[in-house]
Amino acid sequence: MAKKTEKKLFLGVDIGSTTIKAVILTEEGKVMHSMYQRTVPKKDAKLACTGRCSNCGQCNVGALSKTIVDFLASVGKTQNDISCTIVTGSQVVDELHRFLNFDYFVSEVTAHVSGARHYYPDCKAILDVGGQDSKAMLYNPEMNIWTSKMSGICAAGTGAFLDSVSAKLNVPITEMAQKCNFDSDLEVSSVCAVLGATSINKFKNRYPLGDVIAAACRAQARTIMSGVGELFLNYHGDIIFQGGVAYNRAVAYYLKEITGCNIIIPEFHPVMGALGAAVLARQYDSLRGKVEPPKTVETKRTGITIPEFKNFVDAVTDPNLRREAMRVFDNVAKVKGEDGNSKLTFPEISKVKETLQSEELKKTLESFTDKLFDRTLVNKSTAMRTQMTRHEFFSKGKEPLVWRNLFFPSEILAALGVRSLTLETYAALKGSNQKRLRRCFDHAACKGFSGETCSFLRVLEGDQNLPHADFTVTTSQPCQQGERIFADLVRSNCSSSSSRFYTLHTPGRGGESAIRTIAEGLKESVAAMEDALGIKMDPDRLAEACVLSNKARELAIKCNQIRFTSPPLIPGTEAVSYANIFSQLWGKQEMVDLQQVFLEELLERKKEVEKHTHIDETHRLLWLHLPPFYSQRTMTYLEQTCHAPVAFEEVNFVGWEELDPNDPYTSLARKLLTVGFLDPEVRVNRIKQRANTAKITGAVLYNHMFGRCSMADSSFIKYLRQSLTEIGIPLLVLDGDCLDETTDPCSTLTKISAFTEALNLNKFGNIFGPIRK
């Protein structure tokens, strides 16, 4: 803590990919001292030592700590003189707490916004370009929120590219503007850093130095804008340009040329992240002890029912121990009652345990409750889903096996009495085993399928144990690549491929003509399966499948409505894996039973959660598209670390019209069109409608394959962002891959932190959380 006789000082530290920055801020908001220093990994050093010393500097993290200690010492200060320290930056690691005492961590985006607003309080647009990524930040007055966009994994629009150019031309970045020929028309590649560097090598001995520098700086500016400039579309005003790349005034010149906006470079542009962290440290110090983390969804049970406690007593076999357990149960039952509505909370269970005299009985109770608390909040339906998935995907039977994609109506296959295998879901199940996944990717690569191919489809091409299909059905939309891969798989596994494969033509736009086209196609697909498999469709069974689908639909809508109108009841981390709209159980009794159990569990959860949480007390996020299946880290970080629960998931929207058992093909065609994924306009409208109904405060789109997936491409994202902005809902786009973790950009957690901090600022008036009442 700072000395009481002195004015308070606040420290902000920004640990980036190539530099470390620090700022000391006074109580009055004046910069007392700043530091901008290149970081160089220590030769042969470990990431972090295991000793007690925290500032010896003999490991990489320790070296960073020693840099801060030396920085403070240069102005005659130590950490004891600092009232509050906040850190930010892409290279902040978990071990940092052992080496540097700090009070809070904030995202780089929030830090840069705070830094810019410290000197430009009315600024509306900020562009930060550092060594590893570019960040655009824009204030939306209608939503009263700072929106942001970060570049992906390419280095072309970052300081790393300019460092490469500087080294090749032997010109310091700070001198490039002086040597730049701004009238030059020479162009180099702005597609990627590697191609750009290749162009520099090709041109440096063939053109004047000023022309080459101009080409490199223009390419840099263009790549920055192609990566994050979408956020500034239709914006006309000043842009605060900060970060290390702002040392190069030539890049600023070309940014102004491209955007038509005035570019302002602050005095402290290289340390604006650290400055913002120091500004936030001053605010955090003033709120210390007054704020608490926002409420989020519980991931585990908070208590056990009295009947469950009775089960514990009944399980005790030793007569003496049983008498003691029964005595304790009677005392509890007198206070709580014996019905299933009363519960023992975890603290109450601890008190009960203290009343037990037998150590053995204490251990037995502890083991019993641990098992209960480790269960998910919707335990029975989760177990049913697991069992049904295992049966559907891994059981063997005499019935013909039909491969299907996510969109072909499962009711038809249920009525035909065949076994079905949804190939995309089968691939997703592989995601939990990275070793097995790697083997699939390796084998697919040997067949010529590179990373440009969807990872779901690469898994299928590379899986040498893919169950043999007797027939395959797919749809032409929304994934044409999937249709072609399915056809290739059939050719590779079936001698008479043409008679064992059917593509249902699915027009992107709805209307009666599209419905008729799909209905006729469904009839053709049934005829093709009848011929190939030697089976016959029973119209009564198809009508029954429609009736069962309607029953499950009605229950699913009730489940949705409960979640729409309640505080977050279950973690989105778990619920997104349900993917109800893609299930192959529609048309079966199992789906009805599953939805009935899930409904009962949700009603019980609702009663419990609403005792201590109001619907408006938490953030309410909508998760769009699929999650990363290889790890729950991303969604867990969002919901638990950042306290921003997912209230609902797009893949669980059930809202199509009832099926008509007397006209099954037409109604199934209508269902297929109204699910939404075939037509972006229908999809976006449904998202908007459900978002309003569910009181959604923010949306997260997981951008599978970085926009190359047809269900989350750049045009869809642009349309979605504009549409959600109209109704005041901010959108976070997380680039990544649902199965291939090697392409996961290191900026994912930063984006999540920045998004939730902006939501906190809008909801609570500060980024840290609600003020205690």
Can you describe what each PLM-predicted range is?
Residues 196-230, 270, 683:
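Adenine-nucleotide phosphate-binding core of ATP-dependent small-molecule kinases
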Residues 114, 159-163, 267-301:
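Glycine-rich phosphate-binding/hydrolytic loop that grips phosphoryl groups
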Residues 394, 406-407, 412-439, 622-688, ...:
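Redox- and metal-dependent alpha/beta enzyme cores, enriched for Fe-S-associated oxidoreductases
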Residues 89-92, 232-258, 269-273:
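Glycine-rich phosphate-binding loops at beta-strand->alpha-helix junctions
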Residues 39-55, 145-182, 279-283:
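Glycine-rich phosphate-binding loop plus the immediately following alpha-helix
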Residues 315-400, 519, 523, 527-656:
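A charged, amphipathic alpha-helical module
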Residues 102-109, 256-275, 728-735:
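Conserved phosphate-binding/catalytic loops in two-lobed NTP-binding clefts
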Residues 10-62, 145-148, 152-153:
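Short glycine-rich, Thr/Ser-proximal phosphate-binding strand/loop in the N-terminal lobe
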